[in-house]
Amino acid sequence: MGGKKFGTNSKAEEARSKKAEVKKNENEKKQRDKEDKMWEETDTKILDKQKKQKEKEEKAREDAKKKQEAKELLQQEDKEIKERYGKPSDTKVTRFEIQQKRDKEQKQREKELASRPSDPRVVVVPTTTTTTTTTTTTTTGSDDHEEEDFNLEENMNHILREQRLKDGKDVIDARDINEAIGALSGNDGKEQHPERRMKAAFNAYEEENLPVLRKENPSLRLTQVKQLLWKNWLKAPENPFNQVGSQ
């Protein structure tokens, strides 16, 4: 009689196969580790060189990152300048140079206005820059040192306008230099630019009369005295606009 035959246990066979695979992988890993250890660098000089090279590469990456951030920041500033002034800026030009260029253009427009015959009806009211005069006075009272600013240019234009209206004459308002140039006409022989002498004339008048008014009104503050000085100046013969009105 033949021997008894038994079927194969599939689960046991699968377990043995997995166990053999795990053992094989472990042996391969040990072999790789052994080979890697054989090739591992142990020379301290070479190790230091590798370390420095790694640090150099990291520094280069950090510098590149900072450079990119600075570039993006500059682009953002240029965008803001473009939105504010309506035109792109040259990244090689500083803000100081941009302001210098604007000041130069303004002076050129003023020079062009001054070189043309003017119409006394034109009153220029500046919208960008103003001229102020500062007077410092020392007294023996409680206000030992007072300093006040008068906007001479603004007052000068208002006085010219008020005096011409009071005299029944025409007045042409100009908000900037370009408008004033467009309103200019021929010269009739009279002085057409009393405003050119206004600042110097007022300074001389103030220097001469302010100490007198301070002495005559010791109880008034400097601001009040200067207001009184200004009222007197409006009627003073030294005022160039009064000289124009008498011509």
Curated annotation (Swiss-Prot):
Residues 1-146 are annotated as: Disordered. Residues 11-114 have a biased composition (Basic and acidic residues). It holds the Pfam family Ccdc124. GO terms for cellular component: nucleus. Residues 8-85 form a coiled coil. Ribosome-binding protein involved in ribosome hibernation: associates with translationally inactive ribosomes and stabilizes the nonrotated conformation of the 80S ribosome, thereby promoting ribosome preservation and storage. Belongs to the CCDC124 family. This is Coiled-coil domain-containing protein 124 homolog.
